[in-house]
Amino acid sequence: MIEGQTSVPGEPDPSGTDTTLVVVTGVSGGGRSTVARALENVGYYVVDNLPQALMLDMAELAMKAGGAARRTAMVLDVRSRAFSTDLVGAIRELKERGFGPRVVFVDADDEVLIRRFESVRRSHPLQGEGRLADGIAVERGLLEGARDQADVFVDTSHLNVNQLRRRIEELFGAEDARRLRVTVVSFGFKYGVPPDADFVCDARFLPNPYWVPELREHTGQVEAVSSYVLGQAGAEDFVATYADLLNATTAGFEREGKRYVTAAVGCTGGKHRSVAIAEELAARLRQTGLAATAQHRDLGRE
């Protein structure tokens, strides 16, 4: 098989938002858990280790619940010889009932699976007293029927975790769900730095509107305060540099699977300078195509 081979026979294509029900199965060590996390990233409600006997009940519940549950993924593994027959029958029943499940089967070469199990010092769930290779062979036999039902076949032999995640997100994720989201948070240093901040910048080098009587009681969300802050020497360079920094790093964050970035801007109390800068920075990031919002942690605390 070629590197990262993904086979998607037939129509319709499972990409986009048309798919409402996904069944994930495949060999142990093949990457089911990574597939599950990737589906969660793009908005699926994921049920892991679901007994195949409950698949129809879960599908009916998801359809009745509506909302986020309409995009449901069920992750199944093999634990008994009855698994393969039961799973094939359950998938056929789902199709006959009109649920239209898309079946994802993850696989990898035997030598790759052996290396993966040895690297984490785990035994194969079906090897018993035998060797790893014995457990893999037993599982392949049990999964043969399920593999034949697959709509999407993913060979993970030459994929790392991030590559597999991106492949699944490309197949099943709406564009909005795959986008990196940036939250620009204003804060006051006297209340502490936001613990979840990925970036922190200090706006206290700018003159403080607190010392301007007509601005003191207003916040950085008010145009008069914002104009005062952004009109100060160095303010434009500060915002532009921070925006350039964030734009330069977002592509790398997306490749690594990061979905949320928090960029913090602080001033003394989190009322004037940091608020104005955060609003302006979020607006500029949106102009470059990023999904950016501004939040003001410490407004109202003074």
Curated annotation (Swiss-Prot):
Extract the GO molecular function terms from the UniProt entry. Answer: ATP binding; GTP binding
Q: Does the keyword Plastid apply?
A: no
Protein name as catalogued: Nucleotide-binding protein Strop_3101
- Ranges annotated as spanning the membrane: none
PANTHER family in the record:
RNASE ADAPTER PROTEIN RAPZ
Binding of ATP occurs at G26, V27, S28, G29, G30, G31, R32, S33
Report the source organism. Salinispora tropica (strain ATCC BAA-916 / DSM 44818 / JCM 13857 / NBRC 105044 / CNB-440)
Which SUPFAM superfamilies does this UniProt record tie to the protein? P-loop containing nucleoside triphosphate hydrolases (SSF52540)
Stated family: Belongs to the RapZ-like family.
Q: Which UniProt keywords apply?
A: ATP-binding, GTP-binding, Nucleotide-binding
